[in-house]
A protein has these predicted regions:
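Divalent metal-dependent hydrolysis catalytic cores, especially in the metallo-beta-lactamase
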Residues: 129-150, 166-176, 199-213, 222, ...
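Histidine-centered divalent metal-coordination motifs
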Residues: 107-114, 235, 259, 307
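Histidine-rich, glycine-flanked metal-binding segment
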Residues: 31-47, 56, 60-103
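Active-site neighborhoods of metal-dependent hydrolases
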Residues: 199-206, 213, 262-398, 402-403, ...
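Bacterial N-terminal signal peptides
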Residues: 9-21
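Active-site mouth loops of central-metabolism enzymes
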Residues: 113-124, 178-192, 239-240
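Acidic, glycine-enriched loop/beta-strand segments at the rims
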Residues: 37-41, 56-69, 81-84, 388, ...
């Protein structure tokens, strides 16, 4: 695992995560926690937030505990655990009921802002999607490849300026590989890859995404990214037709792997999906190969983003996971809704259905065989309009639990593990003094019923309190074009010249 080795690199990462310019590192770093030797005790001030009542899960321990009070100042958690006689009068007080549950804000490490409403290519949408992520308690996102880096940059700037509410966006820059519009594999020599990494690192990218990349290109990407104090993740293959098996990428030094584990059980004679859909985990040889690959992840401290529901989304949409608890299609404009409904019902991808249930078993093996602290949450839900990426984290959490992962481990994957995978756990991922005040407060106990994360009472990002119902209401009927005259902007093949 590549750790950020400089304070500047960390500050740039957190700064760019909210759209700040590269020179704004001072704005990105919160005040340190008070020194225990000199701190006289908490005194609430005007502008502070005090959270009282409910139960607290800090993202670290195995259980929740009664919340004895949290003091937030200037976007940072100043203290966890307050004196019962503390004067809170100058502060904004959130007095919670007993059923309220406080936890760190969620991370989505495969958080696509891309939509494809017409079936004519993806575009990145940064006006409604950010609001939907935040309203669902997702306070940090990694897009895992930007279809349109220019539009993504504008979106981050809108969030940073306060024009729209949204999560932290840890920019990935464009895809490195054939997933990028206009990528020319033969022209992208290792030297070309290195120069591109230098360019995007200068723009503040500290995490890169590979998809559809050749071995020599991936090695160049990893080497140069690490020299820039950046990390790399990848959607890889089996080694078939010039792809890279995750096994080999781990040996190259990659930091994270998306989707599937790879290894000897995915031979390079066929595509990864062709092997994965019929993977027989009851066969001792196959099971031993998977276990060997898991041990490689653990040995090299490589993070794994399983994205279970990405395959369920294209597959049979398991009803227990893909049921509605909100009117998601209500966020479409009337015209866009007509377009989306004209394509329904979507065909079921039978291959992805089989892969979904295989992956349920392999992710449980990963957890049980030593990978619990390396498991992260990512959704990979580029949307066709029926389901939105912002809601996906809750579906992914439920799918992980249905796979046999304990709720507390699934929640860690969505909080502290994800923060560590990005190298930002110094300031994010848990409820501790000195960290950014990114919190999700829900009604119910997700440690006993993981679906409780869906019922957000409050979302706090950088110390600002949001009411989810108000956020949802603010973007109803606003996703997509309002008429045929606006349709071309929403067609990636037309506007961006890709597929």
């Amino acid at each position: 695992m590549r750790r950020f080795t400089s304070a500047l690199s960390f500050a740039l990462t957190c700064g760019l995560a909210v759209g700040l310019p590269v020179t704004s590192s001072a704005q990105a770093t919160p005040a340190p926690a008070p020194d225990a030797a000199t701190y006289a005790g908490p005194v609430a001030r005007e502008g502070d937030i005090v959270i009282l009542g409910g139960r607290l899960w800090d993202g670290i321990g195995p259980r929740s505990r009664p919340n004895r009070g949290i003091l937030v100042r200037d976007g940072t958690i100043l203290q966890v655990g307050l004196p019962p006689d503390m004067d809170t009068a100058p502060a904004q007080v959130l007095q919670l009921d007993d059923h309220a549950f406080i936890m760190p804000g969620l991370f989505d490490l495969h958080a696509h802002y891309a939509v494809d409403l017409f079936g004519d290519g993806r575009v990145d949408e940064y006006r409604v999607n950010p609001v939907l992520f935040l309203a669902n308690g997702v306070t940090s996102t990694f897009p895992a490849g930007e279809v349109d880096p220019t539009e993504a940059r504008k979106g981050r700037e809108r969030i940073a300026s306060g024009e729209i509410p949204g999560p932290r966006v840890f920019t990935s820059g464009p895809y490195f590989g054939t997933a990028r519009y206009g990528w020319k594999p033969d022209a992208m020599t290792p030297d070309s890859v290195k120069k591109e990494v230098e360019h995007w690192a200068a723009q503040g990218v500290r995490q890169f995404k590979a998809k559809g990349i050749r071995p020599e290109q991936l090695q160049a990407l990893i080497t140069e990214a690490h020299s820039q104090d950046a990390t790399v993740t990848g959607h890889l293959g089996s080694g078939f037709r010039g792809t890279v098996n995750p096994r080999d990428a781990i040996l190259m030094g990659i930091d994270r792997i998306e989707h599937f584990l790879g290894g000897d059980e995915l031979p390079d004679s066929v595509s990864a999906y062709a092997s994965l859909e019929y993977l027989n985990l009851d066969d001792p040889t196959t099971r031993a190969q998977v276990e060997k690959e898991i041990h490689l992840f653990v040995e090299h401290h490589t993070y794994f983003d399983a994205t279970l529901t990405a395959y369920g989304y294209y597959g049979d949409r398991e009803p227990a996971v893909f049921k509605y608890w909100a009117d998601e299609m209500g966020f479409l404009t009337p015209y866009a809704r007509q377009v989306v409904e004209s394509h329904l019902p979507r065909p079921v991808n039978e291959q992805f259905t089989r892969i979904y249930y295989v992956k349920r078993r392999t992710v449980k093996m990963f957890y049980e065989d030593g990978g619990a602290d390396l498991l992260t949450l990512g959704t990979d839900h580029p949307s066709w309009g029926e389901f939105w990426s912002g809601f996906g984290a809750h579906r992914e959490l439920q799918a992980m639990v249905l796979a046999g992962i304990p709720p507390v481990a699934a929640l860690r994957a969505a909080t502290i593990n994800a923060a560590r995978a990005l190298g930002v756990d110094q300031r994010l991922g848990s409820v501790e003094a000195g960290k950014y005040a990114d919190l999700l407060i829900v009604g119910g106990d997700p440690l006993s019923d993981i679906t409780a994360t869906r019922h957000a009472l409050y979302v706090i990002k950088a110390g600002k309190v949001y009411h989810p119902a108000e956020l949802f209401e603010s973007v109803k009927g606003k996703m997509g074009p309002t008429s045929e005259a606006e349709a071309d902007w929403w067609k990636g093949n037309v506007r961006l010249g890709g597929g």
